[in-house]
């Protein structure tokens, strides 16, 4: 908006609109050019008045006059477009945009946080990798072992012998030996438990007899 129309001899946009000679040191000359300044100053003149705009710029420091001229021109054009609210409607629209953008930003932050939590969660692992890894699927192998042992036991009972199976499988023979040894250990454990119960009963009888003897002699 800065213009040098006074130095070139042609009037500034404000003086051109007012149809007067642009004097040296015109307060409007640096900010309203000869070509487009007239249309911009027309809105200022209609809303604020030329004298009021001149007084406003004259009371400001030179460093602040450029921003003031831009602000006055913007407010005047906004008032012509919206005579009731003027630039306030633009301010409300910008504030609403800020609120909407903040809400969208908060939603994106929450989605990013949920994505990070889901990425760090162990449930996000591929379930197929669990079943493909032998170290993580003992349950599947245990069932295979149970079915294998069940088949071996069934074959042993079908042969009716304590040796090897007729098909010559060494695993059935070893399993039969392990089963026999397990039965032997179970019988030994039962004998020990029975012997311990007998000992406890005998010891209890001795205590009861001693107690009664103490009472009778007292």
From Swiss-Prot:
Task: Explain the induction of this protein.
Answer: By auxin.
Gene Ontology terms: cellular component: nucleus
At the top level, the lineage of the source is Eukaryota
Every copy of the LOB domain together lies at 10-112
Q: In which tissues is it expressed?
A: Expressed in roots.
* Signal peptide per UniProt: none
Cystine crosslinks: none
Q: Which GO terms describe its biological process?
A: callus formation; lateral root formation
Please give one Pfam family short name.
LOB
Function (record text)? Involved in lateral root formation. Regulated by the transcriptional activators ARF7 and ARF19.
**Protein family according to the UniProt entry:** Belongs to the LOB domain-containing protein family.
* Name used for this protein in its record: LOB domain-containing protein 29
């Amino acid at each position: 908006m800065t213009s040098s129309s006074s130095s070139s001899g042609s009037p500034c946009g404000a003086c051109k609109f007012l149809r007067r000679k642009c004097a040296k040191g015109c307060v409007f000359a640096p900010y309203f050019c000869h070509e487009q300044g007239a249309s911009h100053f027309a809105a200022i003149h209609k809303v604020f008045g030329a004298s009021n705009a001149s007084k406003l710029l004259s009371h400001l420091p030179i460093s602040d006059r450029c921003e003031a001229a831009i602000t006055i021109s913007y407010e005047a054009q906004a008032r012509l477009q919206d005579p009731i609210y003027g630039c306030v409607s633009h301010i409300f629209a910008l504030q609403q945009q800020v609120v909407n953008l903040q809400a969208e930003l908060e939603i994106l932050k929450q989605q990013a946080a949920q994505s990070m939590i889901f990425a760090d969660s162990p449930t996000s692992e591929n379930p197929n990798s669990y079943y493909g890894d032998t170290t993580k699927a003992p349950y599947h192998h245990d069932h295979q072992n149970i079915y294998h042992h069940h088949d071996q036991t069934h074959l042993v009972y079908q042969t009716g012998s304590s040796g090897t199976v007729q098909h010559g499988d060494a695993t059935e023979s070893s399993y039969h030996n392990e089963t026999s040894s397990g039965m032997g250990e179970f019988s030994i454990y039962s004998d020990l438990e029975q012997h311990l119960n007998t000992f406890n009963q005998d010891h209890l009888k001795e205590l009861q007899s001693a107690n009664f003897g103490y009472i009778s002699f007292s």
